[in-house]
Structures are given as structure tokens and as C-alpha cells.
């Protein structure tokens, strides 16, 4: 519900961050149930902020929301080189890859990762997001999905597992 309110601009980043912190605390309690199988894991989502960008608030927010949606999240951190994303694709077969950026100067890193993904594993889903990212950019570089907010990312992930 919070994600929907954020995407509809009913609440803003401070409220979203407070909600994400509360979710993070609840995930600490729920994590053992995911591990022992009492709560079904929907899949693995690998996320990182691309090379040249040290910003992580958006990435962390998306990670918490997606984890709260029942996905296992592998966070590669910030300033992540293309080869680390590609290694993660091999290490986590079937995972969905999430690329985050806040700086326009790092969009070229996103494009490089998507291009390399096509050469190695064209079926692997790559999502992109961040302040400078648009649907036009997503289409231009051939990424599979763009969302301006975490709510859209979770909805997309839930759709692809139904296919």
C-alpha cells in the first residue's frame, strides 16, 4: 500500500524511508521463516548501483520493498562494475538483475551491462531505475523493465513469475 501511495505522490521519500525501516525491522523477524521454507521465496533479485555512482538510498529502498514482497535480495552495493553484475548472473541462475543509478553520468554503465547481458544470457531479465532513468532510455538500451518507483518493480516481478 505504501508503494502505491508513493507512486501516486500521496506520500514522499521521508515517509517511504520510515516505512522501509519498519519493513526492514519486520523482515529481521520474518527472515527465519523464509529460510526454513515456511514462507515461499518467489525468486532471487540481484541489485546494485552501477559503476561511478555511490548513491544507495533508492537502491536500499527498492531492496527492502522487494524483499518484503517475498523475494530473496542479493545487494551488490554501490559503484558496481559490469563484470560483478555478470558474475552474479552466473552465480544466481534465474535471478532478476536490478540496476540503479542517480547520476546521468553513470547511464553508460547501465547500457554496457545490458549489452553484455544480451551476449551472455539474452533471456535474463534486467530492470533499471533511478532518478535519471526513463522509459525511453530503457527502450533505447534494451533493458526489460523500468519503473519510477519500488511499487512498480514489485508488481513487475510478481507478473513475471506468473508467466
Regions found by a protein language model. Name each.
Residues 1-163:
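Domain-level signal for soluble alpha/beta catalytic cores
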